[in-house]
């Protein structure tokens, strides 16, 4: 039987526990989350336990990364279920601060990353990546783990985090973990719970569109021809709108046309009120 995860709610308590582990010579992995945990999140914890002696997960629904018309109010919050899931995954510590702990009165600092945060989700969700970068910077400095783990499903987010960690000399290894998928290929996401059964049946067309573009690139086609066809296909399949489908350089996220280097195909589309994102890599 797994031991129940220990829960702390203050930065001081988090630092005290991590400091005690450090005194024992133990290494620490951090998995930042917004809760509503699924198997994808738990795969990050399990990978963290392969890379370090102790695993810390944070659960904080970060208000600064939601736009004014987004789903902050209805984003699922289920701490008891999350704590049970983390316990079963072998996580040692859950950091679950409230908003006042993370953003005390007078808080006035924002971390913004130019370049990799431009375009894609950055164009559709202005301010989103500044909110992500600020809260993740805080979490990394609060915990100072040896390694922090993030899912590749949020590929642009991962690129933003890698960039600011490098630029700001934050001494933490940033580890990307491959996307976990449902049996029909849909990327696991806390927001999948928003979908009706009818929408859920349409959702796998997103990964099919991405794999179709990958096949086309391998056959020598250009992104400028493939991406508009994929958008049309998603709308025909029943998606309400497509924010973007783009082919980018896997490292820099600069726009790319042909398969002459490692690329990433990224998409965001909407089914009703649910916004789905996904991406896959393709190698020459």
From Swiss-Prot:
InterPro entries given in the database record: Cyt_trans-like, Pantoate_ligase, Pantoate_ligase_C, Rossmann-like_a/b/a_fold
Positions annotated to bind (R)-pantoate: 65, 157
Subcellular location: Cytoplasm
Active site: 41 (proton donor)
GO molecular function: ATP binding; pantoate-beta-alanine ligase activity
Chain residues that bind ATP: 34-41, 151-154, 180, 188-191
Reactions listed under catalytic activity: (R)-pantoate + beta-alanine + ATP = (R)-pantothenate + AMP + diphosphate + H(+)
Domain of life: Bacteria
Residue numbers binding beta-alanine: 65
Alphabetically ordered keywords of this record: ATP-binding, Cytoplasm, Ligase, Nucleotide-binding, Pantothenate biosynthesis
GO cellular component terms given for this protein: cytosol
Keyword Nucleotide-binding annotated: yes
Record-linked Gene3D superfamilies: HUPs, Pantoate-beta-alanine ligase, C-terminal domain
Enzyme class: ligase
GO biological process, alphabetically ordered: pantothenate biosynthetic process
Pathway it works in: Cofactor biosynthesis; (R)-pantothenate biosynthesis; (R)-pantothenate from (R)-pantoate and beta-alanine: step 1/1
Pfam families the UniProt entry points to: Pantoate_ligase (PF02569)
EC number: 6.3.2.1
Subunit and partners: Homodimer.
Function statement: Catalyzes the condensation of pantoate with beta-alanine in an ATP-dependent reaction via a pantoyl-adenylate intermediate.
Family statement: Belongs to the pantothenate synthetase family.
Note in the entry: The reaction proceeds by a bi uni uni bi ping pong mechanism.
Name of this chain's protein: Pantothenate synthetase
Taxonomic path: Bacteria, Pseudomonadati, Pseudomonadota, Alphaproteobacteria, Rhodospirillales
